[in-house]
C-alpha cells in the first residue's frame, strides 16, 4: 500500500472483520484513522489494538444524520478529510429474490 502518512481517513463499518482488516492496512501505511460502527465495544477493542485511531459510534442507516456524522468525524481528525472508506452495509430485506 502507498504511504498514507498524514492522510485523514474515515472507515465506516469498522466494528466487523473486513473493517478491522482495512484499519490494520491503513494504520500500517501511516494514515490518521477514524473508525465508525454500531458496536462501541468492538470500536473500543480497535482503539486498544491500534492505539492511535479515533472512534465514533454511528449507524449508517440513519441517513438524515450522515452529514452531521461526517462533520463530527472530520473535526475529530483535526479539521480535514482526505478519504472515506464506505465499508458499512445495510439491507432492507433479507430475501435476494425480492431485492432489485
Region spans (language model):
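Flexible N-terminal pre-Rossmann segment of NAD(P)-dependent oxidoreductases
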Residues: 1-7
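Conserved glycine-rich cofactor-binding loop
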Residues: 8, 15-16
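Rossmann-fold scaffold of SDR-type NAD(P)-dependent oxidoreductases
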Residues: 12, 81-88
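NAD(P)H-binding Rossmann-fold N-terminus in SDR/SDR-like oxidoreductases
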Residues: 17, 21, 91
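Conserved glycine-rich Rossmann-like NAD(P)H-binding loop of the short-chain dehydrogenase/reductase
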Residues: 29-44
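Conserved mid-core segment of classical short-chain dehydrogenase/reductases
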Residues: 67, 91-100
Amino acid at each position: 500500500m502507498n504511504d498514507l502518512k498524514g492522510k485523514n481517513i474515515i472507515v465506516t463499518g469498522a466494528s466487523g472483520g473486513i473493517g478491522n482488516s482495512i484499519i490494520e492496512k491503513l494504520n500500517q501505511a501511516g494514515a490518521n484513522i477514524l473508525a465508525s460502527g454500531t458496536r462501541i465495544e468492538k470500536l473500543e477493542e480497535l482503539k486498544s489494538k491500534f492505539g492511535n485511531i479515533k472512534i465514533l459510534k454511528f449507524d449508517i442507516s440513519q441517513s438524515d444524520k450522515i452529514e452531521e456524522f461526517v462533520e463530527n468525524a472530520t473535526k475529530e481528525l483535526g479539521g480535514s478529510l482526505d478519504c472515506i472508506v464506505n465499508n458499512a452495509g445495510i439491507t432492507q430485506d433479507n430475501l435476494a429474490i425480492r431485492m432489485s
